[in-house]
Amino acid sequence: SGIEAAKKWTASNGLPSERVVILAPRFMEKVDAPGAGTLWWNNTELEARGIWRGGADSDPRADPGKHRVVSSFTALDVLIESLLAGKKAGRLPMLSRIALAGHSSGGQIIQRHALFTRIDEAAARLDSTLNVSIRHLPANPSSYCSLDGKRVDAKSGAVATPSASFVARCAGYNSWHFGTDAERWPLPPRCASFPGGTKAAVALFATRTMKYMQGGNDTCACNQERGQYENVRDDPCTCESHGLETTCSDEIGGSYRLMRGRNYWKTLGEVYGGAQPPSHSLSVVPNVGHDHTLLWQSTEGIAAIFGA
């Protein structure tokens, strides 16, 4: 879908398709049967430290000799740094923008990576005058990392701390990767070692170019893939949700993805003093459900990737 979106954009602007370079990293899990020497992540919901979409380190068993690990966030930073280095070396002289786009689980890692990326350090090391803009595009994620413990109240619509009764039955609802607390799960090492801590990360997050994308029809509130996941309800479902996560930490954000995206957007305004950061925007694409192809090839999707 990214390739087709790039083709549409270059064609409409009279440019060769070679003007766009697409990198598509795959974060593998043990079930994917990765080959020797391939990083993989222990993607177990009950052990959040292994989840690649939350910046976890790769499983040390992927490196039997030395047990070295790599954070999924580090992997993305290295990709970005390699592109910047390519421009500095003259291999990518026309590079002007890097867009990190992800849908569903991919959208989750993109939002969280934007919070704890170290790419500013890399850009400063290479050359601060490279003049390459970087943007993050989280699309239709099932959950977000909230920046404080408040959520949108389902009844009043106000942004507030959840009730004591909810907190009692959903211990650690704001722990990583749903929030930045460490009550239930600690922050991954890559995040915990962020210079200046979480407060500094939240402050920098306001300066990121964030383009949140939501399908206007991504409103299925259950999971039709019954019994396949440990983090979803085993309810009958007649609509298309493609793995909607339904833990209490997920559902305090809303019943379905579109609601969760809008609620998260509302909480951003509260975190940053009454208004969302100017470099952040939310687009709802009409007549699109949980479908990456339709979303990225939409007018709104192409504009988010290639527009101003």
Label the model's feature ranges.
Residues F27-K30, L282-H292:
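Histidine-bearing beta->alpha loop at or near hydrolase active sites
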Residues R112-I134:
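Conserved hydrolase catalytic core segment
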Residues T74-S96:
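Conserved acidic catalytic loop of the alpha/beta-hydrolase fold
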Residues L100-G106, I110:
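Gly/Ala-rich beta-loop-alpha elbow adjacent to hydrolase catalytic centers
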Residues D127-E270, G274:
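The feature captures the conserved acid-bearing segment of alpha/beta-hydrolase catalytic domains
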Residues G2-S82, L126-S128, I134, P138-L147, ...:
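Active-site machinery of serine-nucleophile hydrolases
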Residues R97-A99, R135:
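Residue in the alpha/beta-hydrolase core beta-strand immediately N-terminal to the catalytic nucleophile
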Residues Q297-A308:
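Catalytic active-site module of serine/aspartate enzymes centered on a nucleophile-bearing elbow/loop
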